[in-house]
Amino acid sequence: MGFTGRRGKAEIIEAFSKHVSPYKAKFFSMVGIDFVPARREGVWYWDLDGRKLMDCHCNGGVFNLGHRHPEIVKTLVEALDELDIGNHHLISEQRARLAEKLAELMPGDISRTVFGVGGGEAIDFAIKLARGHTGRKKIIYAKGGYHGHTGFALAAGDEKYRKPFEPLAPGFVEVPFGDAEAVEKAVDDDTAAVLFETIPATLGMPLPPEDFYRRVREICDEKGCLMIMDEVQTGLGRTGKMWGIEHYKVVPDVIVTAKGLSGGVYPISATCFKEGLDDFMAENPFIHVSTFGGAELGCVVAEKVLEITSRESFLENVRKTGEALSEILGKLKDEYDFVDEIRQKGLFIGIKMVEEGWGPLLSISCYHSGILAVYANNDTSVMQFLPPLIVGEKEVDYIREKLAGAMEIASQRREMVEFIRKML
């Protein structure tokens, strides 16, 4: 017997509601989604009833390489014959190899890595790094951003995630995203770091002004604070370059990567930084540890992920399919009056509608048309569109047909927007 389909769909949903989250179960019931993933392969998800969806959510980039990529699965299976998670207290060949590969692929002189399990943990360490190195306390971050659900990462996120758990760690100062003047005013002699997502996904993928990060870099240099870039979603080829920040020709002090580094099969994250920023750890090298961070099985998988995503043919495919989707989305924008703007770098895409509530409506419409996509939680006028980076011509043709169908469904159900706004 396999690992899916051991129970019927109704029984699974009931057990999930009772023992995992009645609130998520209720939400999906309210919007008419009863999808329970079973088989998954490449760009596709199948539920227990055989219904097929193209995964254009990718769990925020976890499935950049699609589901169960054959090279990734083969690597993990072979590694299980020899390795386990390892011991984070000891020197590790696998962590050394992965860190070496990351240093090779990082922009500028970023050459050192501390590993974690998820993006929030990696952001937490980036903030520890900034405070430990500079001796300062203040962290500047963007309103509407999202960096994770853990301590420091949560404190640097939007109010809707922080408020139920306050008081949180002090010293965090919010500025509007893309506003260099606001950053300049906020940064002072007690600022340890400025922290941004290169393009904030949860905020709806607004593209920063072209000179924004150049100005942020200058401000950080002038004030002696660190520039931290959260590349959890924009990194690993998603934008057509290895790292999203490369589009803006700036080298930060710290880059955080996670999600896609896992290959979709083994959780791992990395905080990558310039040599010397961890000088505060000289006195106690064990002041920051992570039991499962940089597990040796995960390192082997992540090394294979980097090998695949750094291939020029891979990045060229992202750029090529991104251009094809840009043309398709441009035509849909012209055809449907509720589409306001297409925000795009490579295959990192936000479809901006005319008002809040349209993002969820288009997401539901996509589901009924055969595509899995989600809305931006901090701007519900936007639907995130993140197809796997392995899509080719056949998949683009599928997207053309199904996205047009979803737009038509949304257009015919536009009266639901007000209801959705009240529900959220």
UniProtKB/Swiss-Prot annotation:
Cofactor(s) this protein requires: pyridoxal 5'-phosphate
InterPro entries in the record: Aminotrans_3, Aminotrans_3_PPA_site, Class-III_PLP-dep_AT, PyrdxlP-dep_Trfase, PyrdxlP-dep_Trfase_major, PyrdxlP-dep_Trfase_small
Modified residues annotated as N6-(pyridoxal phosphate)lysine in this record: K259
PROSITE patterns in the record: AA_TRANSFER_CLASS_3 (PS00600)
Gene Ontology terms, MF aspect: identical protein binding; pyridoxal phosphate binding; transaminase activity
Pfam families with a match to the protein in the record: Aminotran_3 (PF00202)
Protein EC: 2.6.1.-
Family: Belongs to the class-III pyridoxal-phosphate-dependent aminotransferase family.
Protein name: Uncharacterized aminotransferase AF_1815
